[in-house]
């Protein structure tokens, strides 16, 4: 007899080429067409990439310098990459403040965490100002401990927040407190922060696009970058045109792995999500009445949330590593990492494991989204020695609030502003580098598989044992390379 999780996984449809979020957003409002670039043009700033980082950068530029001439080029349509395919968690980083402090020092780590938390409040004001329909719910997130085997809230992070007057921003909860948000019998505790909003990510992309077009930003979709020629002005070369710009901002996310300069800066992986049919009655039965986001505390965590039409969207639990950053190839590794039925079934099984009450639920869509995975788990913002080429990369699947803050940083760098955003601790080269191929893919794939296997053993009541030690050894090998350059 198949388990409930296996029966649930059997209901998962094939992995789609576009996310359910983007399909729904385009149905609601296809928006004004943005044709490809044809011919030559000039601009004060050219933004390369139409995801959140590029769109927020263009927004900040036009906010601070009305009348500035901004061109944005996007290889597909705005939001076709990770920005339109994620969980829609516009979140702070209080839960990882100890990690931030490890890399940046305590004062700077807390300053960056506070900057991200502020973006959540600012999003509320942005939505009201622009009358943006992005299905935003600023209700917080529960970092659930779904079983005694999962890590409890980090006590070191709690101490750091208390020292800086932010103890109330991440509150430890017991089992009853965790289950108040949603009635999972797995929840034994966790931590809650109010500093998160769930959004429909593709609708946020489309609303940003709408606002920018209204401000006179020239957006060229289906216009991939072929070459970036340094100089003053710099030249962005596309298949049928060129943009000469005083400043260029490079925000192509995971696709930057194809550029020699960033090949060692991060690994590229795809995360999988599924979404259920509308199940309002079943959600009421388990007490899931709010739009609080939820993430558990396994090594390959699940993240999940309600939608406005009473579905559950869940992702995580596994990932598909891309060989040498090959996101668009047709080889077996690229196809598996992009469309694997097995990887799509992992979050589907996870939903029924977390909520056995939802056994038999039908899933309506499955998709995957690319991530530029920095080993430190934090982005970096870099200006080339020429002074007029800037990049924001490495968002590592935590990019919604980080790209809004990052847009401020990249705008400051492009405008030459000497302000707090130009001096965030994430401004500079990547903190860590990843191994070269052909080592990177097998090491990353092995780490992912071992962590997923260990989580599954714990779910079944078996200890990780040798799996934990093997995962640690492979991860240590992955982290061992410490070259002096991101090249090659």
Predicted regions mapped to residue ranges:
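Glycine-rich active-site loop/strand segments that organize a redox cofactor
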Residues: 85-115
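Internal hydrophobic alpha-helix adjacent to the cofactor/substrate pocket in enzyme cavities
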Residues: 62, 402-424
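Active-site substrate-recognition segment that forms the wall
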Residues: 88, 129-137, 225-227, 233, ...
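Extreme N-terminal leader/targeting segments of oxidoreductases
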Residues: 1-45, 63-64, 68-69, 95, ...
């Amino acid at each position: 007899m198949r388990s409930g999780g296996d029966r649930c996984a059997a209901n998962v449809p094939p992995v789609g080429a576009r996310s359910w979020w983007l399909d729904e957003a385009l149905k609601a409002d296809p928006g004004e067409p943005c044709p490809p670039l044809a011919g030559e043009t000039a601009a004060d700033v050219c933004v390369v990439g139409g995801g959140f980082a590029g769109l927020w950068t263009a927004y900040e530029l036009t906010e601070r310098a009305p009348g500035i001439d901004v061109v944005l080029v996007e290889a597909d349509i705005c939001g076709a990459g990770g920005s339109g395919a994620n969980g829609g968690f516009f979140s702070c980083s209080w839960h990882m403040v100890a990690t931030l402090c490890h890399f940046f020092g305590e004062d700077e780590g807390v300053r960056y965490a506070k900057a991200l938390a502020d973006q959540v409040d600012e999003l509320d004001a942005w939505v009201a100002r622009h009358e943006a329909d992005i299905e935003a719910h600023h209700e917080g997130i529960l970092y659930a401990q779904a079983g005694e085997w999962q890590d409890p809230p980090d006590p070191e992070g709690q101490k750091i927040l208390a020292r800086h007057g932010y103890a109330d921003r991440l509150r430890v909860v017991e089992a009853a407190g965790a289950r108040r948000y949603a009635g999972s019998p797995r929840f034994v505790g966790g931590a809650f922060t109010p500093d998160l909003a769930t959004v429909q990510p593709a609708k946020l992309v489309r609303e940003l696009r709408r606002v920018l077009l209204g401000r006179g930003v020239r957006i060229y979709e289906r216009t991939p970058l072929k070459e970036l020629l340094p100089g003053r002005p710099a030249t962005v070369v596309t298949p049928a045109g060129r943009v000469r710009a005083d400043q260029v901002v490079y925000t192509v996310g995971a696709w930057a792995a194809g550029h020699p300069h960033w090949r060692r800066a991060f690994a590229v992986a795809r995360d999988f999500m599924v979404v259920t049919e509308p199940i309002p009655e079943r959600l009421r039965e388990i007490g899931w009445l709010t739009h609080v986001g939820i993430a558990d505390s396994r090594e390959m965590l699940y993240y999940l949330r309600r939608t406005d039409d009473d579905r559950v969207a869940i992702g995580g639990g596994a990932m598909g590593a891309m060989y040498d950053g090959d996101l668009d190839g047709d080889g077996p590794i690229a196809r598996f990492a992009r469309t694997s039925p097995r990887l799509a079934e992992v979050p589907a099984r996870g939903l029924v494991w977390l909520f056995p009450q939802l056994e038999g639920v039908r899933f309506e869509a499955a998709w995957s989204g690319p991530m530029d995975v920095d080993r430190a788990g934090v982005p970096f913002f870099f200006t080339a020695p020429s002074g007029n080429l800037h990049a924001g990369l490495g968002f590592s699947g935590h990019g919604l609030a980080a790209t809004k803050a990052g847009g401020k940083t990249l705008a400051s760098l492009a405008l030459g502003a000497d302000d707090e955003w130009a001096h965030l601790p994430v401004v500079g080269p990547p903190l860590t580098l990843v191994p070269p191929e052909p080592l990177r893919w097998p090491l990353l794939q092995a780490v992912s598989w071992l962590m997923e296997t260990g989580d599954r053993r714990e779910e079944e009541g078996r200890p990780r044992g040798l799996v934990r030690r093997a995962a640690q050894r492979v991860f240590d090998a992955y982290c061992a390379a410490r070259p002096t350059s991101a090249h090659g």
